[in-house]
């Protein structure tokens, strides 16, 4: 699937960045909604 045989570093960083932003967004949204404090 990958021509180089491995995942490009920029793609790993991009996915990691999106994942981190999503997790932080869900965490702050949960805390704002009042369900984050119960977890």
Curated annotation (Swiss-Prot):
The encoding gene: psbJ
Highest taxon of source: Bacteria
What SUPFAM superfamilies does this protein map onto?
Photosystem II reaction center protein J, PsbJ (SSF161021)
Where it sits in the cell: the answer is: Cellular thylakoid membrane
Subunit description? PSII is composed of 1 copy each of membrane proteins PsbA, PsbB, PsbC, PsbD, PsbE, PsbF, PsbH, PsbI, PsbJ, PsbK, PsbL, PsbM, PsbT, PsbX, PsbY, PsbZ, Psb30/Ycf12, peripheral proteins PsbO, CyanoQ (PsbQ), PsbU, PsbV and a large number of cofactors. It forms dimeric complexes.
**Protein name, UniProt field:** Photosystem II reaction center protein J
Entry function: One of the components of the core complex of photosystem II (PSII). PSII is a light-driven water:plastoquinone oxidoreductase that uses light energy to abstract electrons from H(2)O, generating O(2) and a proton gradient subsequently used for ATP formation. It consists of a core antenna complex that captures photons, and an electron transfer chain that converts photonic excitation into a charge separation.
Q: Which UniProt keywords apply?
A: Membrane, Photosynthesis, Photosystem II, Reaction center, Thylakoid, Transmembrane, Transmembrane helix
């Amino acid at each position: 699937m990958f021509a180089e045989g491995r995942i490009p570093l920029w793609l790993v960083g991009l996915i990691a960045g999106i994942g981190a932003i999503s997790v932080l967004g869900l965490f702050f949204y949960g805390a704002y909604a009042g369900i984050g404090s119960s977890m």
